[in-house]
Amino acid sequence: MSEMAPRNYFEFFQLPEMFRLDQSVLDSHYLELQARVHPDKAAHLSDVEKRLSLQWATFANEAYQTLKRPLERARYLLRIHGVDTREEDNTAMPAEFLLEQIEWREEMQDAIAGRSEAALDRLGFRLKKEMDHLIESLGAMLDVQQSHPDAAVLVRQLAFLEKLKRDLDQAHALLED
């Protein structure tokens, strides 16, 4: 690998700077790069070359982890375009979205109290459908409309849903014990 750093993660994997990307292409580029820069491949190299190989492998892992997850990929794209999602200090959401969150959390608590995995499964199905819809909308906003401020709102909503998904996964684990 050359010592010249790529401009961004998309360039590193030779991918277009877009939200919608072919996961199989990302995976194959990642595996190809890992095969070339993995520290085990550098055992015969000088200390400087080993360190450089480790840096490239670390960069490849970080880039891959960011681009393979829709929420992280959207955040990264917005950052490239100078848009701060302000997730830490801007929790303003449409009232309908917030009411839905409250309703879903209440459903989850009821399912836990009733030890109903079926109710958790139904909630998980609806949550996945909503997340898929948001991801599709993000693709349109980022790739077609290039409406970055509006996309930042969707990123904040998707972050809420991902948190709910983690909580739902924990609820499933709780019922399995």
UniProtKB/Swiss-Prot annotation:
One of its GO terms (cellular component) is iron-sulfur cluster transfer complex. The keyword Chaperone applies. GO terms for molecular function: ATPase activator activity; protein-folding chaperone binding. InterPro entries: DnaJ_domain, HscB, HscB_C_sf, HscB_oligo_C, J_dom_sf. GO terms for biological process: [2Fe-2S] cluster assembly; protein complex oligomerization; protein folding. Signal peptide: none annotated. It holds the Pfam family HSCB_C. Residues 8-82 form the J domain. Keywords: Chaperone. Belongs to the HscB family. Interacts with HscA and stimulates its ATPase activity. Co-chaperone involved in the maturation of iron-sulfur cluster-containing proteins. Seems to help targeting proteins to be folded toward HscA. This is Co-chaperone protein HscB homolog. It comes from Methylococcus capsulatus (strain ATCC 33009 / NCIMB 11132 / Bath).
